[in-house]
Amino acid sequence: MQVDDLVSIIVPVYNAASYVEQTIKMVVKQDYPKWELLLVDDCSTDGSVEVIKQAISRETSKNPELEGKFVLLEGTVNEGAACARNRGIEHARGRYIAFLDADDIWFPEKLFKELAFMKKMNAAFVCCAYEFGDEQARGTGKVVHVPQKLTYQKALSRTVVFTTTVLLDTSKTGKELIRMPNVKSEDTATWWKIMKQGFPAYGLDEVLAIYRRPPKSLSSNKWKAIRRIWYLYRKQEKLSVIYSLYQLVFWAARATLRRI
């Protein structure tokens, strides 16, 4: 049964032993108290599961009221982030679903402010601004702002929706719509899919998250990013070559400005 005011926070975990305890502590410090944290292990090989178990034990020992708020889903096969998030969606009990990557940062007021904004806008899909961080998650001063409203057509050329900032109301979208396809840039493909069904993303233009971006991370490889977005245009969205090129030009320009 869906719990009306509960936010289900889904964290895919793969070899995140260095970060995941910080992630758990960060969620515990959220101003909004009605949450459950689903940690979905994707067959980690670095001891992430044991770190999670120990961290949960410490947190519940310090505060018995946290008992039952943590769910650890252990994987037996490495399937990727999309499948891990989908497992989390299947097990989520909350009306609201938020995504958080194990190496990213939420500010304590993130859930509270986004949920209030969602209710104010009567929205099914919201996101917020975020700041790029270094390997220690220290802000670099480079902020990605979000428009107040982002439709499917506008989103094709501006990938400003960052997974760690997303909050969804499944009483409006249902769960099936937000399941992620098992492709590269599965998160972007999912946001487009949701928008195409008439649920634009409403942006709270306030920095409530930090995107930890090591210099050699996958996301900072620009050529790989271009190939991924091209694949989405042509294979997922079935756009023509001409229209794909048109969108790619604007996407590349905005992506370059965002990273300068």
Predicted regions and their residues:
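N-proximal low-complexity "stem/linker" segments adjacent to membrane-targeting elements
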Residues: 1-29
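Short loop->beta transition adjacent to catalytic acidic/histidine clusters or analogous donor-positioning motifs
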Residues: 4-7, 28-39, 47, 68-71
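Acidic helix N-cap motif at the loop->helix transition within catalytic regions
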Residues: 18-21, 46-55, 105, 109
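A conserved acidic beta->alpha catalytic loop
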Residues: 26, 33, 41-52, 77, ...
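Glycine-rich, basic loop-to-helix element that forms the pyrophosphate-binding segment
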Residues: 74-92, 113
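Conserved nucleotide-sugar donor-binding catalytic segment
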Residues: 90, 145-224, 228
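Short aromatic/hydrophobic "clamp" motif used to bind/position activated sugar donors
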Residues: 97
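Conserved donor NDP-sugar-binding/catalytic core segment of glycosyltransferases
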Residues: 109-140
